[in-house]
């Protein structure tokens, strides 16, 4: 019995260490975030979209790290950051994402999205969601696939961008306060 308790204590200590490391890594800003924000701001200006704020989703980061950033281009700073789930399809794991634009793949798609209207989910009419429209070849089927931004539990989805409930509510309120045509850029 003592042997098993010792093993359980060791495993618990290792898991606590992993969680602590993930928390520290989660709070570190990606080194290229300002460059990516500048690229997104230039994209928005060139295509006539909102040049005040944008959303960057860095799926190159592990799902235990904050990887969704609402960025204020005028102040050149992050105004909100969050954990974000990705699609469970393909070779995706709970830590890393695989990408596809194919219907039924259950993968996330990289590229630029125009953030649309607030609505409820297709398969859960009581759950709020935000529509997104893919603007690139890599995500052109987003509307047909039913890809949304919505609250979710855990790091995996059917291809949607999922956020913890409290962060989803903050992002939703923030988006409603901004002019239309906000762009979200998912990259790895």
Please report, for each region that a protein language model flagged, where it lies by residue:
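N-terminal Sec-pathway targeting helices
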Residues: 1-16
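Cell wall/extracellular polymer interaction/catalysis modules
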Residues: 21-158, 165-188
């Amino acid at each position: 019995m003592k042997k098993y308790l010792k093993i359980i204590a060791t495993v618990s200590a290792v898991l606590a260490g992993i969680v602590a490391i993930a928390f520290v890594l989660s709070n570190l800003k990606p080194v290229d975030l300002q460059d990516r924000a500048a690229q997104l701001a230039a994209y928005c200006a060139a295509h006539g979209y909102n040049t005040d704020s944008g959303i960057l989703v860095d799926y190159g980061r592990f799902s235990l790290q904050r990887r969704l950033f609402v960025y204020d281009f005028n102040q050149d700073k992050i105004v909100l950051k969050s954990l974000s789930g990705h699609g469970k399809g393909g070779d995706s794991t709970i830590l890393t994402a695989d990408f596809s634009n194919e219907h039924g793949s259950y993968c996330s798609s990289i590229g630029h999205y125009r953030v649309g209207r607030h609505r409820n989910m297709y398969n859960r009419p009581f759950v709020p969601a935000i529509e997104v429209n893919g603007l690139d070849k890599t995500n052109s089927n987003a509307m047909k696939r039913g890809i949304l931004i919505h609250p979710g539990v855990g790091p995996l989805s059917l291809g949607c961008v999922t956020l913890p409930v409290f962060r989803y509510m903050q992002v939703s309120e923030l988006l409603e306060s901004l002019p239309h045509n906000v762009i979200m850029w998912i990259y790895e």
